[in-house]
Regions:
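Acidic/histidine-enriched, glycine/proline-rich intrinsically disordered or flexible terminal extensions
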Residues: 207-226
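Short Asp/Glu-rich motifs
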Residues: 38, 193, 213-214
Length: 226
């Protein structure tokens, strides 16, 4: 059985979306955001105090992962019959790995600075210049997505893959920051295609329902203010 520790619309949405695409059963453990401050007992499971935490199996063969893009790759690779993986022998394998890593290191990281210094920090610690600079930084890097989907429905391999889930979360985060209108036209159309996927919609519904059932606020993590 898979166990996913998750905050609403945090990075842990990536593996949740993947699980819905793969139609895999999972126990979803909802946490308030940020868990390292509001769910201190979680530190016993993940000393980083961050989500996601994905756990599968039991010791000594237990799988424990804390990186969301790596989870996308792992879930796709361990369920190749679903067609979300790209094999090492495929010509698009390099592009596939590049998009998986770019999704967090290049497209999500700058947005975390925008969130921290524009929303999460108290007013006296907010940094408007950081917000402005890293918003521009993100939008400049998003040109790579615009180029990739200008003449293709998805990022690589001529089909929907785990890379689209990983990058799709970065676009979801940008939506929470009000940046969608600054996407290029191809990226806007691509983002709409991703949102239209039934698994994406199921993931949104699953986190909302689980939050309510477990007594956690359903407010998306990127929208939280101090």
């Amino acid at each position: 059985m898979l166990h996913l520790h998750h905050c609403v619309s945090a990075r842990s949405f990536r593996p949740l979306w993947m699980l819905e695409e793969l139609q895999l059963p999972c126990t979803l453990h909802m946490l308030p955001f940020p868990p390292r401050a509001l769910a201190r007992s979680f530190l016993e499971l993940n000393p980083l105090g961050t989500v996601p935490l994905l756990v599968q199996g039991k010791a000594p063969n237990e799988v424990r992962m804390t990186e969301s893009a790596a989870m996308c790759q792992y879930l796709a690779a361990t369920h190749p019959e679903a067609g979300l993986d790209v094999a090492p022998t495929h010509p698009a394998y390099g592009a596939y790995l590049n998009w998986l890593h770019m999704s967090d290191a290049t497209l999500t990281f700058p947005q975390t600075l925008v969130l921290r210094y524009g929303r999460f920090e108290p007013a006296q610690r907010q940094q408007p210049q950081v917000v402005q600079d890293y918003t521009r930084w993100f939008l400049a890097r998003l040109r790579a997505v615009e180029a990739a989907v200008a003449h293709n429905e998805y990022l690589c391999a001529g089909r929907f893959t785990a890379a689209d889930v990983a990058v799709g979360y970065a676009l979801l985060l940008a939506q929470h920051l009000g940046l969608v209108e600054q996407f290029g036209p191809a990226t806007q159309a691509y983002w709409q295609r991703l949102q239209d996927r039934p698994a994406y919609q199921r993931a949104l519904a699953a986190q909302h329902q689980a939050a309510l059932a477990q007594g956690v606020s359903p407010q998306p993590s990127p929208d939280i203010r101090p």
